[in-house]
UniProtKB/Swiss-Prot annotation:
GO terms for biological process: amino acid biosynthetic process; aromatic amino acid family biosynthetic process; chorismate biosynthetic process. It comes from Pseudomonas aeruginosa (strain LESB58). Belongs to the chorismate synthase family. Residues 42-61 are annotated as: Disordered. Keywords: Amino-acid biosynthesis, Aromatic amino acid biosynthesis, FAD, Flavoprotein, FMN, Lyase, NADP. This is Chorismate synthase. FMN binds at R125, S126, S127, N237, A238, G277, K292, P293, T294, S295, S296, R318. Gene3D superfamilies: Chorismate synthase AroC (3.60.150.10). GO terms for molecular function: chorismate synthase activity; FMN binding. Its cofactor is FMNH2. CDD domains: Chorismate_synthase. Signal peptide: none annotated.
Length: 363
């Protein structure tokens, strides 16, 4: 099965299934000398892990990461970093009754046609459980970038019909929704409580921002920074759309409104999301992700079995009514992985480039 590795110089390979014994990752290309321990990775894993509120799946996983290689005496050695997270709360019996059925809007049908065999327990490899390893790997990238003054962080900007205005980064970590507006939290909680009573699910929008990114990252033409970000962010389970900067709002904008004018004091706007011509401009990198509603709901739906016969499906098990609630750390991880990979590529080709034009400050 190909397609399990991302990156050119900083690479992340993941393996493991939702109900397998463990999840693993190999992180290759991390520069040597970075101080690193499991604690550095655990913070983001704790932000993503299930069972932390009544609004997420009640599967209880500690998601405690083990560093198996690539770190000696508290520092990275430049060799591959092996990571492992053990699965401890699988309930595979929840899926035995549907092993020959295709859950609507899941990967069951497509995996079956592609491989001729599939792990039906919790979606197997297609489960969002896999993203735990992305978060662990992304935490390594985030720490390295932080040493260069680059900060990657995200928040929920919409849940279903509820738009969430940005008010403060301080508020994001103070609630289960990663909401930047504390006044919206009661409304979000009430909406999710009603959603559970309706036995339904809903989508969400996540915004992720990288600040302190220097100009010059991105490899035109096919490895443009925005193209790489779209690739990485679209690879996250349930993501159905990615915007950079103003994104689809650009359609209704005029050129006089959309263009980010330059002054000696800095850019006057950031509709481009910090990327011009596929290369970082030095402004904040801004991306938005649209996540679809969870397909695993207890409301009956029509489907077929492996023989092609019609069936009525009710998906059992423990599932997130809104996968977007836990998606913020995943989006941060993927952006950090992309940025570190691009930074190392820029360093490898253009480390000797010197430009007299000053770098504009971020307004």
């Amino acid at each position: 099965m190909s397609g399990n590795t991302y990156g050119k110089l900083f690479t992340v390979t993941t393996a493991g299934e939702s109900h397998g014994p463990a999840l693993v990752a190999i992180v290759d290309g991390c520069p040597p000398g970075l101080e690193l321990s499991a604690r550095d990775l655990q913070r983001d894993l704790d932000r993503r892990k299930p069972g932390t509120s009544r609004h997420t799946t009640q599967r209880q996983e500690a998601d405690e990461v083990e560093i198996l290689s690539g770190v000696f005496e508290g520092k990275t050695t430049g060799t591959p970093i092996g990571l492992l997270i053990r699965n401890t709360d699988q309930k595979s019996k929840d899926y035995s009754a549907i092993k020959d059925l295709f859950r609507p809007a899941h990967a069951d049908y497509t995996y079956h046609h592609k491989y001729g065999v599939r792990d039906y327990r919790g979606g197997g490899r297609s489960s969002a459980r896999e993203t735990a390893m992305r978060v662990a790997a992304g935490a390594i990238a985030k720490k390295y970038l932080a040493g260069l003054g680059i900060q990657v962080r995200g928040y929920m900007s919409q849940l279903g019909p509820i738009e969430i205005p940005f008010r403060s980064w301080d508020s994001v970590e103070q609630n289960a929704f990663f909401s930047p507006d504390p006044d919206k939290v009661p409304e979000l909680e009430a909406y999710m409580d009603q959603l559970r009573r309706d036995q339904d699910s809903v989508g969400a929008k996540i915004t992720v921002v990288a600040e302190g990114v220097p100009p010059g990252l991105g490899e035109p033409i096919f490895d443009r920074l925005d193209a790489e970000l779209a690739h990485a962010l679209m690879s996250i389970n349930a993501v159905k759309g990615v915007e950079i900067g103003a994104g689809f709002a650009s359609i209704a904008q005029r050129g006089t409104e959309h263009r980010d004018e330059l002054t000696p004091q800095g850019f006057l706007s950031n509709n481009a999301g910090g990327i011009l011509g596929g290369i970082s401009s030095g402004q904040p990198i801004v991306a938005h992700l649209a996540l679809k509603p969870t397909s695993s709901i207890t409301t009956p739906g029509r489907s077929i079995d492996t023989a092609g016969e019609p069936v009525d499906m009710i998906t059992k098990g423990r599932h997130d009514p809104c996968v977007g609630i836990r998606a913020t750390p995943i989006a941060e991880a993927m952006m950090a992985i992309v940025l570190l990979d691009q930074l190392l590529r820029q360093r490898g080709q253009n480390a000797d480039v010197r430009v007299d034009t000053p770098v504009l400050p971020q307004l």
